[in-house]
Amino acid sequence: MRKGEVLKLGIVPYMEGKEIQLKAFERVKKGETDGILILLQHPPVYTIGVSGGFDENILVPLAELKKKAELYKVERGGKITFHGPGQIVAYPIFNLAKWQKDVHLFVYKLEETIIKLLEEYGIKAGRKPKYTGVWVGDEKICAIGIAVRRWITWHGIAFNVNTDLSYFGLINACGITEFGVTSMQKLGINEDIEKVKEKMVDKFSEVFGIHFNEITLDRLAVIDNAKA
């Protein structure tokens, strides 16, 4: 079984989270571990991926959007999405050379991880043709946007546990106009987010065939003031 590390944090500002990813990326690139899974939440923030769609997917004046949350253009695939408290953001920094050099398979396994997680709560979730992510009916509960460099992945997934979904009303999330978003809470499941994180780690381990040892930020030589 592959050997990896998991880093569990609390609410971390978006750009600090990016720096943590880059530190983890370097550790994986050096071969010190097969992969690092970072789990955290962000303060309210909108991010726009390389697919763009800046103008048509923001439904309010830009100044109004920026009053609600920060806004960043980022390196991941996809268009605009929202991150905020109550949403688990998982950044799997994995060396695909240790699995298969297949990005589509990696995304499929990310989806499978969340589908299996939701099964634990009696929620039937699945995929939707032409779209990435995990869906419950016609509503997306987990968005996926990754980047890959030298076959090492970064960025990742955003899974709605008890997120304030009103923030999604200001955008066409992921550029999708015909379908909505949902959360575990909206589906009637009120679970402590830390317990959901634990189950998520188990499902990552199961689907990707990797054993995780928990680490701290000190292991990545990051000076951080995150609320762990």
Curated annotation (Swiss-Prot):
Belongs to the LipB family. This is Octanoyltransferase. Its main location: cytoplasm. Pathway: Protein modification; protein lipoylation via endogenous pathway; protein N(6)-(lipoyl)lysine from octanoyl-[acyl-carrier-protein]: step 1/2. Its EC number is 2.3.1.181. It is an enzyme of class 2 (transferase). Keywords: Acyltransferase, Cytoplasm, Transferase. InterPro entries: aa-tRNA-synth_II/BPL/LPL, BPL_LPL_catalytic, Octanoyltransferase, Octanoyltransferase_CS. Disulfide bonds: none annotated. In the reaction, the free carboxyl group of octanoic acid is attached via an amide linkage to the epsilon-amino group of a specific lysine residue of lipoyl domains of lipoate-dependent enzymes. Substrate binds at R76, G77, G78, K79, I80, T81, F82, H83, A143, I144, G145, G156, I157, A158. Pfam families: LplA-B_cat. Residues 31-212 form the BPL/LPL catalytic domain. Gene3D superfamilies: Bira Bifunctional Protein, Domain 2. Signal peptide: none annotated. GO terms for molecular function: lipoyl(octanoyl) transferase activity. GO terms for cellular component: cytoplasm. It catalyses: octanoyl-[ACP] + L-lysyl-[protein] = N(6)-octanoyl-L-lysyl-[protein] + holo-[ACP] + H(+). It is found in: Cytoplasm. The record marks K140 as: Lowers pKa of active site Cys. GO terms for biological process: protein modification process. Catalyzes the transfer of endogenously produced octanoic acid from octanoyl-acyl-carrier-protein onto the lipoyl domains of lipoate-dependent enzymes. Lipoyl-ACP can also act as a substrate although octanoyl-ACP is likely to be the physiological substrate.
